[in-house]
UniProtKB/Swiss-Prot annotation:
SUPFAM superfamilies: Ferritin-like
Gene Ontology molecular functions: 3-demethoxyubiquinol 3-hydroxylase activity; 3-demethoxyubiquinone 3-hydroxylase (NADH) activity; metal ion binding
Uppermost EC category: oxidoreductase
Binding-site residues for Fe cation 1, renumbered to this chain: 54, 86, 89, 176
Top-level division of the source organism's lineage: Eukaryota
Identification of the protein by name: 5-demethoxyubiquinone hydroxylase, mitochondrial
Length: 216
């Protein structure tokens, strides 16, 4: 398993989604074990969706940091810390995509733009609005990781790689919930203007993104 220090640079390298999409693999070879088609499809979905999700999160924090480093410098280190964790998450799933020959979502270019726009846009509304965005996103993603851990529980003993992936799912879930707590308890996210409207809209967008990445 690569360390965080080794993995973070991978996240900065862009591999053409068109090249990746040309790779087809109905059965994914995990080490020396051959998975069934059903298990391969589960693995494929987990990796594809989570890579896309971590890309979006990475871009959200990038957009927030781009604005808040100037408008509210005192929060910039907190944003940077959360962003660094998302870089590691993304690098981990980028590595899984390449290792397991998983086709990334066709929507990756869109998430690049949409994530940054969401991060920068909420930051322009102020620090509390940016933190409300974090609260909304991490609430959905934390629940999403919990769903995946339940969905893949029966696979853990089928191959060592499943145990490794599930350990990352649990680790990243805990990181996302830490971000949620930071936003709510540390930076008063719930005091953001139109908090309920903002967070509900963002959560609906996140759930729609997960649905689309599972299919495209």
């Amino acid at each position: 398993m690569l360390s965080r220090r080794q993995l973070i640079p991978i996240a900065t390298k862009s591999v053409s989604p068109f090249l990746r999409s040309s790779i087809t693999c109905r059965r994914i070879s995990m080490g020396r074990k051959e998975l069934s088609e059903k298990d391969s499809n589960i693995l494929d979905s987990v990796i594809r969706v989570d890579q896309a999700g971590e890309l979006g999160a990475n871009q959200i924090y990038k957009g927030q940091h781009f604005i808040l480093q100037f408008t509210d410098p005192k929060v910039a280190p907190t944003i940077q810390h959360m962003w660094d964790q998302e870089k590691y998450h993304l690098a981990t799933f980028d590595n899984y995509v390449l290792k397991n020959r998983v086709r990334p979502t066709f929507l990756r270019p869109f998430w690049d733009i949409a994530g940054f726009a969401l991060g920068a846009g909420t930051a322009l509304l102020g620090t509390k609005a940016a933190m409300a965005c974090t609260e909304a996103v991490e609430t959905v993603i934390g629940g999403h990781y919990n769903d995946q851990l339940r969905e893949t529980a029966h696979l853990e003993n089928k191959a060592p790689e499943f145990k490794e992936i599930r350990s990352h799912l649990a680790e990243f879930r805990d990181d996302e919930l830490e971000h949620l707590n930071t936003a709510v308890e540390g930076w008063n996210a719930k005091e953001a203007p139109a908090h309920a409207l903002l967070t509900n809209a963002i959560q609906m967008g996140c759930k729609a993104a997960i649905w689309m990445c599972k299919r495209f």
